[in-house]
């Protein structure tokens, strides 16, 4: 699992929830590290902040779509929830599996619940 977020506090919450459930997790806080992390880690789940400094989430979504990324993506942002939903819709039309969305700030239990559903339940195409 890969967490892509520029806020260390958010990253720590997701990492703690993931490790609690037995996931191996890596985190990056800079979009310049994104491609290398995808190729090296080969994550099956990505938590992606769509409003980071540098390249925006849509550019990173484009990178994943161009490579037919087979895993699940969780879109998250501190922006308006409509922006998260719009970004998720665009990602779906580009062929990505959106496993859920998170509006910041969120609680650790929300991440735990989402990860449990990703591990056992259906996903959206």
Q: What residue ranges belong to the model's regions?
A:
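Conserved acidic segment of CheY-like receiver
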Residues: 1-9, 14-18, 46
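Acidic, metal-coordinating helix/loop segments flanking the phosphotransfer/catalytic sites
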Residues: 27-45
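Acidic catalytic/metal-coordinating carboxylates
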Residues: 29-30, 56-62
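Conserved phosphotransfer cores of two-component systems
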Residues: 39-41, 64-70, 93
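Receiver (REC) domain active-site loop signature in two-component systems and cognate sites
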Residues: 52
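Alpha4 helix (beta4-alpha4-beta5 surface) of REC/receiver domains from two-component response regulators
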Residues: 59, 79-100
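C-terminal output helix
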Residues: 82-83, 103-119
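The C-terminal output helix
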Residues: 96, 115-125
């Amino acid at each position: 699992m890969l967490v892509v977020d520029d806020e260390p506090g958010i990253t720590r919450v997701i990492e703690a929830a993931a490790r609690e459930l037995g996931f191996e997790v890596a985190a990056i806080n800079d979009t310049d590290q994104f491609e290398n992390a995808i190729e090296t880690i080969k994550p099956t789940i990505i938590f992606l902040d769509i409003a980071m400094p540098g390249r925006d989430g849509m550019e990173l979504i484009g990178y994943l779509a161009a490579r037919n990324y087979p895993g699940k993506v969780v879109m998250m942002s501190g922006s308006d929830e409509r922006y998260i939903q719009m970004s998720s819709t665009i990602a779906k039309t580009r062929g990505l599996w959106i496993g859920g969305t998170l509006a910041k700030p969120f609680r650790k239990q929300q991440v735990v619940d989402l990860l449990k559903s990703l591990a056992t339940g259906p996903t959206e195409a």
